[in-house]
From Swiss-Prot:
Basic and acidic residues: compositionally biased ranges: 1014-1031
Function: Involved in chromosome segregation during meiosis and DNA damage repair.
PANTHER family: PROTEIN TIMELESS HOMOLOG (PTHR22940:SF4), TIMEOUT/TIMELESS-2 (PTHR22940)
Amino acid composition bias (Basic residues), ranges on this chain: 948-962, 978-991, 1046-1055
Similarity annotation: Belongs to the timeless family.
UniProt name for this protein: Topoisomerase 1-associated factor 1
Gene expressing this chain: TOF1
Region (Disordered): 572-595, 936-1074
Swiss-Prot/TrEMBL keywords: Cell cycle, DNA damage, DNA repair, DNA replication inhibitor, Meiosis, Nucleus
One Gene Ontology cellular component annotation held by this UniProt entry: replication fork protection complex
Localization per record: Nucleus
Source organism (scientific name): Cryptococcus neoformans var. neoformans serotype D (strain B-3501A)
Length: 1074
């Protein structure tokens, strides 16, 4: 806002609501502020020493300076409800800060009265320089309507306050003199703590004021305001403020100094905010030379870009080229049209689509410190690492966990930022020492200097904050970026520990990696943050790319050292939600019965498990399957957004990270189809056109090679499937990029779309080998392998080999822990005292009893499709000893189920493959060896392998007609004979045998506890009658059973029929040959 040149007269009439408009508030407050400022004191010329004729300007406080300062504090409180901060603007116009600084310098050492005046002045200085969060201020007044507030003038005023404060070292020296007596006391009361806190807050406020951004040719005031932070750091060092900060940080665990750890955290964050550790670790004498080299390299790159355009303002040679097409004629007036593609030149003349500018960084600010300030910070950073980092961070984390009132939400960001800064700084220092003096000099800076943030409790808290920021609505992007950067540096620290020469560091790194990777949520977060990137800042984009690159690289390195890995994964909440709904329905039914409250069990509800708490289960883990999860279009979009800024990359490292992640998708996950899009091809063309300006680094060459590979794959696919050009215009959903060539011939089934429903109704096709060929197991496996390999499904074979290797490793582990070796020679005895006998190469019975069933759990859509509907792959699974559970029937369910639910259950059972527990490790090892041998040397067959198979006949399911209501006897539960359906004799015999067996069993079970003597008598009479009948039939049939229990072969009459038409009751239902 524009301030008036002179205030109106004090006796001017006030409007009715004079405090409603900012101009009216100015007219009221400015005269009062100006009067009070004039009453504070003034400057006068004093001869010093007396009679010397030399005069100096000295500030003389007024007689009532203390009361005036208190009146100014009362006026300051008027701004609490004023969005315009009118009183603050009045104090700036009245030059109050100049008076306050002079009072502090003059009165700080004038005894008790002078200290009191100086402290009140410091209180006003802290209020005037308090940081203004413009974003938060605008957010608060957002709902109040169109309020226009000039925050730029307020920020400019604070910048001038900072410059005024730093003109000499006397103000900071006076503030330190106020704090030192309080710091020296062994027992500090509340007043001492408030004085120390006030002095630290003044320093914090000065550090928080950002420097002005000035051009390199700026002079005068602009140049002065651009280097205030450097001057402040220099004064803080010369006045021993930095040593004071080190003392407070190292004693943060002490009771008397712990209250100041949060303000020290804020000060340290402001000191290092915007400074890159890579810049701080450099030799400051060479910084100007390196900066000049970067500028020359940037200029060279820009010239190379301009030379390709080739357009000059004044040229000696004029060029005009005519391009004729079938319908039009285009004239080009460019010299580059001689050698360039005319279509590309025409594209350059098209109107460019405006690109939305993205924020560079929300976490840090731009700073340009001088070389002297950087040298001071180098020594200060190293001293902070060696003396107090672990103690200081531990005290902060303890206060955060205990939820102290002094902890603010923004303190989490400061902890993350400082931790990531000092970890990266330590790693860079160690790398520099390693280059200079070898590994022996690394002992000067051990990794334990930053061990506190790498503790498992700290890492868990860090990940918990990451999840909270991610789940917030809207997401806390700034804290999330700080979390990700800190997590990345912790991973790099663990990686450095794993390669250390210190055995203790290696052991700790092994434990930390195991605990980190066991929690699958941490691994899943890397995929989530990369997938969900939209329009956040460029620094956030760089952070998530770096995080994903480091995590995948370390996880791959760790998985190679382990035969098998397990993870703790959160269960699917869909099933749990259904169970909760069923439980709520049961509770509702229970409520309908109206059970009195006094009979309810209150303790049961108190100790009931939390329904909202997540449940977890342990799963086998393979890096290949996790790596394939990164083959998603959302991840590709994030990588391409990062790659688009290839001309802005600062060094080869960013290019190396994005190329590494793209290589995992294209080469290792075989997902090059994700890049078959028009927008992606345009980016690739831009990179190929400007590859001459890429840095001369291996990562640049890898990028060009990868792009060439993707383009070659794309055009080969276009030759095979021209419809790919149409698919390149659409997005690639999950699994769609595998079939980017378009629809298949099965889309038109010539059956009005009924073929798919019929196939779905019939279930998956089952195959079997033609029996007349009598193939061995190895021959059957070679045939199945040849079919799958020939269809281009080799990735399925690689996947099943990995699964078998996991199962084999798990079973071998059980054998080793149980038997202590396969062919031990020691004599062992079992529980009965008998010697344990073990054959060579076979586990003991005890080890076999510990084997568990392994459930095959496909993760990718292609794997799920293969185990469900690929008949050749299902045949291979059977050859590898995998099995399927029997299809569920209606009797398997406790409650009645609908036909749709029964069909869904049967569909799930068709894909629930499992490896039985009784499969021995030797059999699995043989299967793995056969598959690997075929993968190295695929088998060659003379005949078509598909002709050696045939469809397996399905067992027909017969339905039994339900009896009608009239034919059902409600008393006996039987069907009346008159209403029974006619059956052939074979069905009658089978049914009668089943009925007889059921009758005998039912009579025994139901009457076992019956005390009715009449029922007992009838039961034994029935048994005696059945026994006589059996004896008679046996005598007529000629003793069909031999003494050894083997069934006697029946003779034939006239080549057909059996000797006896009616088998004995003992064999009814078992004779299926007649």
């Amino acid at each position: 806002m524009e301030l008036p040149d002179s205030p109106p007269p004090l006796d001017a009439p006030s409007p009715p609501h004079f405090l409603d408009a900012p101009q009216d508030r100015w007219n009221v407050f400015y005269p009062a502020v100006q009067t009070l400022v004039n009453a504070l004191g003034g400057y006068e010329e004093v001869e010093s020493p007396p009679d010397s004729g030399i005069f100096e300007t000295v500030y003389r406080p007024g007689d009532s300076v203390l009361g005036v300062l208190k009146d100014l504090k009362k006026l300051w409180r008027k701004d609490d409800e004023d969005d315009e901060r009118t009183v603050a603007r009045c104090m700036y116009r009245a030059e109050l800060m100049k008076e306050l600084v002079a009072i502090v310098v003059e009165c700080a050492e004038r005894g008790e009265w002078g200290r009191k005046v100086a402290l009140v002045a410091c209180d006003l200085i802290a209020a005037l320089t308090w940081p203004i969060d413009v974003a938060q201020e605008l957010k608060e007044i957002e709902d109040e309507g169109p309020v226009v507030t000039d925050y730029a003038s307020l920020l400019r005023a604070q910048l001038e306050y900072k410059a005024l404060f730093l003109k000499t070292t006397k103000p900071l020296k006076s503030i330190l003199s106020l704090m030192v007596p309080c710091l020296a006391k062994p027992r500090k009361d509340e007043k001492d703590s408030r004085i120390i806190s006030l002095g630290l807050h003044v320093v914090r406020n000065l550090l928080a004021i950002k420097d002005a951004v000035a051009e390199g040719t700026a002079t005068g005031e602009k140049e002065e305001f651009a280097h205030l932070q450097s001057d402040l750091i220099t004064q803080l060092d010369s006045l021993t403020y930095l040593q004071l900060f080190l003392t407070l940080a190292s004693c943060a665990d002490k009771t008397d100094l712990n209250p100041f750890n949060v303000i020290v955290l804020d000060i340290l964050h402001l000191i290092f905010r915007g400074i890159k550790p890579s810049e701080l670790v450099q030799d400051q004498k060479r910084v100007p030379i390196d900066s000049l080299a970067k500028l020359l390299e940037k200029e060279k790159k820009q010239k190379a870009l301009n030379s390709r355009v080739g357009s000059t303002r004044h040229s000696r040679f004029g060029t005009t080229i005519t391009v004729k097409t079938a319908e039009q004629r285009v004239v080009l007036h460019r010299q580059t049209a001689i050698i360039e593609n005319p279509g590309k030149i025409l594209d350059m003349t098209k109107r460019k689509k405006a690109v939305v500018a993205k924020r560079m960084d929300d976490l840090t600010v731009f700073v340009n410190l001088s070389s002297d300030a950087m040298v001071i910070l180098q020594s200060f950073s190293k001293a902070f690492l060696e003396i107090c980092y672990n103690t200081f961070i531990e005290s902060i984390l303890r206060d955060i966990r205990m939820e102290r009132t002094k902890i603010r939400p923004s303190d989490n960001i400061r902890v993350f930022y400082l931790s990531s800064f000092f970890i990266e700084y330590l790693l860079l220092l160690r790398h520099k020492l390693l280059q200079k003096g070898g590994s022996r000099r690394l002992e000067e800076l051990p990794l334990g200097l930053v061990a506190q943030i790498a503790e498992m409790d700290s890492v868990k808290w860090l990940f918990a904050r990451l999840r909270i920021c991610w789940d917030d609505k809207p997401k806390a992007w700034t804290e999330l970026q700080a979390c990700i950067e800190c997590f990345t540096q912790i991973l790099l620290l663990i990686d450095d520990m794993s390669t250390s020469t210190n055995e203790e560091d290696v052991e700790v790194a092994e434990i930390l990696q195991h605990q980190l990777y066991y929690n699958y949520d941490i691994l899943d977060s890397a995929l989530a943050v990369v997938r969900e990137y939209k329009n956040q800042s460029i620094a956030y984009l760089d952070s998530i790319i770096h995080f994903a690159y480091v995590l995948l690289r370390m996880l791959e390195k760790y998985s190679k050292t382990k035969a098998f890995m397990f993870i703790r994964k959160r269960k699917n909440t869909h099933k749990k939600r259904k169970e909760r709904q069923a439980a709520s329905q049961a509770n509702a039914d229970r409520e309908q019965r109206k059970i009195p409250e006094e009979y309810g069990d209150e303790g049961e509800e108190a100790f009931a498990p939390d329904e909202d708490a997540p449940s977890y289960a342990e799963h086998a883990f393979t890096f290949q399957s996790f790596e394939k999860r990164f083959a998603q279009e959302a991840v590709v979009n994030t990588l391409l957004t990062y790659l688009e800024r290839f001309l802005e990359f600062d060094g080869p490292e960013p290019m190396k990270r994005v190329v590494g992640l793209m290589h995992r998708q294209v080469i290792k996950a075989h997902a090059e189809g994700l890049y078959f899009k028009v927008s992606t091809l345009i980016i690739f063309r831009r990179i190929l056109d400007k590859q001459h300006v890429l840095p001369a680094a291996p990562s640049s060459r890898d990028l060009i090679t990868l792009i060439t590979y993707i383009l070659r794959k794309f055009f080969k696919h276009v030759e095979k499937e021209p419809f790919t050009l149409v698919e390149a215009l659409s997005s690639k959903s999950r699994g769609k990029w595998k079939t980017v060539g378009g629809g298949s011939d099965d889309d038109d089934d010539e059956m009005a779309g009924q073929r798919g429903r019929i196939k779905e109704k019939m279930g998956p096709v089952e195959l079997q080998f033609i029996k007349k060929h009598k193939f061995s197991w190895s021959q059957q496996m070679s045939i199945a392998f040849a079919i799958i390999w020939g269809d281009g499904h080799g990735y399925l074979i690689k996947w099943i080999v990995e699964v078998l290797e996991q199962v084999l490793a798990a079973k071998q582990e059980i054998v080793l822990t149980t038997d202590g070796g396969i062919n031990g020679d020691e004599d062992e005895e079992d529980e009965d005292g008998n010697a344990r006998v073990r054959r060579f190469g076979r586990p003991s019975d005890e080890a076999i009893s510990k084997f568990t069933q392994f459930d095959l759990q496909p993760e990718e859509s292609e794997q799920i499709t293969a185990v469900t509907s690929n008949p050749h792959f299902r045949l291979m699974l059977k050859l590898l000893s995998f099995d399927l559970p029997p299809p569920p029937m209606e009797l398997d369910f406790e409650e009645d189920v609908s036909s749709e639910e029964l069909a869904l259950a049967r569909e799930k059972s068709d894909s629930a493959w499992f490896l039985p527990a009784n499969v021995l490790p030797s059999d699995i090892e043989a299967s793995i060896g056969a598959l690997k041998q075929y993968m190295e040397e695929p088998p060659t067959l003379d005949d078509d392998p598909k002709k050696l198979l045939r469809r397996k006949a399905r067992a027909t399911r017969r339905r039994r007609r339900s009896p009608s209501v009239e034919s059902y006897d409600s008393e006996t539960g039987e069907v009346r004979p008159g209403h029974q359906h006619k059956k052939n004799p074979r069905q009658k015999r089978a049914k009668k045998a089943v009925e007889t067996q059921n009758y005998k069993s039912a009579a025994f079970i139901e009457d076992s506890d019956d005390e009715d003597p009449e029922a007992t008598r009838r039961f034994f009479e029935n048994e005696e009658r059945l026994r006589r009948e059996m004896d008679e039939l046996a005598a007529q049939g000629g003793h069909p059973m031999m003494e050894r229990g083997v069934k006697r072969k029946r003779g034939k009459k006239n080549g057909k029929g059996a000797i006896s038409d009616t088998p004995p009751p003992s064999q009814r239902g078992n004779d299926r040959e007649t």
